[in-house]
A protein has these predicted regions:
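Short, glycine/charged-enriched secondary-structure capping and boundary segments
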Residues: 31-34, 66-69, 95-98
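Clamp-loader machinery-focused feature within the broader ASCE/P-loop NTPase space
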Residues: 3-63
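Charged, glycine-rich active-site and insertion segments that engage polyanionic ligands
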Residues: 6-7, 77-78, 87-192, 196-268
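Structural signal for conserved beta-strand scaffold positions within catalytic alpha/beta enzyme cores
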Residues: 18, 83, 101-103
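Helical "lid/switch" subdomain of P-loop NTPase nucleotide-binding domains
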Residues: 52, 56, 60, 64, ...
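Conserved catalytic/switch belt of AAA+ P-loop NTPases
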Residues: 66-83
Length: 268
């Protein structure tokens, strides 16, 4: 009905539940039990259905997926669970076999930016940065734009980018230990780093700042574009890709990150 649509648009529809998680890198069993399994025992307040939306569902731990399995197998007639993900391969086969898969196309960047501008008190730069990183996923864009954890992650990445060239061996080892605190969000860490060096490469090639993502760091970006060769920038981007592959193959985390920082230091 019209009332439900208005409530849904404003975020006040009690029968549409967005599942939140405290840890930025994972959705744990307690999150699932409290916000889905337990809550689903309560019938809808005003609607025919009660809908649970788990964004970034690829972050569900194995324990959380197992806890969710019985509810997915035998939900109440009014219960609907929507798992939003960019990587269905992270789900247990028992989960996948009990779900209906629907593929969504990414939203246009203009729509994501417009949504952020209308719904949140953000600068134009913050909206455009979140949009660029989210790649058409509006929920992801909201998380990036509003999460203190993501802002801190970005600062950690920028610290390495600023100072890798001057780091001593001891400082590199200390930084590796610091980055280990971000194991659960290492993909975001590496993606941010790759975005930076792509910006440097683009600016070095074109001297055009309009297409850049890190516009708030123009002086540093221009300096690195001037001082680093094309080959050096390409080597850094290749090193980041290698890190992702090695981590998926369970190569030692500290060793892989140490080699990455050393590659950046040598290239700069």
């Amino acid at each position: 009905c019209i009332r439900d649509s208005i409530q849904s648009e404003s975020g006040n529809q009690p029968d549409i539940i967005w599942v939140h998680h405290e840890k930025p890198g994972s959705i744990g069993v307690d999150d699932v039990r409290e916000q889905v399994i337990g809550d689903m025992q309560i019938k809808p307040y005003s609607s025919r259905y009660k809908i649970y939306i788990i964004d970034e569902a690829e972050k569900l731990t194995q324990q959380a997926q197992n806890a969710l399995l019985k509810t997915i197998e035998e939900p109440p007639a009014y219960g609907i669970i929507i798992l939003l993900t960019t990587n269905a391969d992270t789900f247990l086969q028992t989960i996948l076999s009990r779900c209906v898969r629907l593929d969504f196309r990414p939203l246009r960047d203009t729509l994501v930016t417009q949504y952020l501008q209308e719904k949140y008190d953000l600068t134009d730069y913050e909206c455009r940065f979140a949009t660029a990183f989210a790649q058409g996923k509006i929920g992801r864009a909201v998380t990036i734009a509003t999460s203190k954890e993501f802002a801190q992650l970005k600062e950690e990445v920028m610290h390495v980018i600023r100072y890798a060239k001057e780091m001593t061996t001891a400082e590199i080892m200390a930084e590796v230990k610091n980055i280990a605190n971000y194991k659960l969000t290492i993909d975001d860490y590496l993606d941010l780093m790759a975005m930076w060096y792509r910006d440097v490469l683009v600016f070095k090639s074109t001297k055009d700042s309009n297409a850049l993502i890190f516009k708030d760091e123009m002086s540093l970006l221009a300096e690195q574009a001037k001082n680093c060769s094309y080959e050096g920038l390409e080597d850094i981007l290749k090193s980041i890709d290698k890190v992702k592959l090695r981590l998926k193959a369970n190569v030692n985390f500290d060793l892989v990150i140490e080699l990455l920082i050393m590659a950046i230091k040598e290239a700069m």
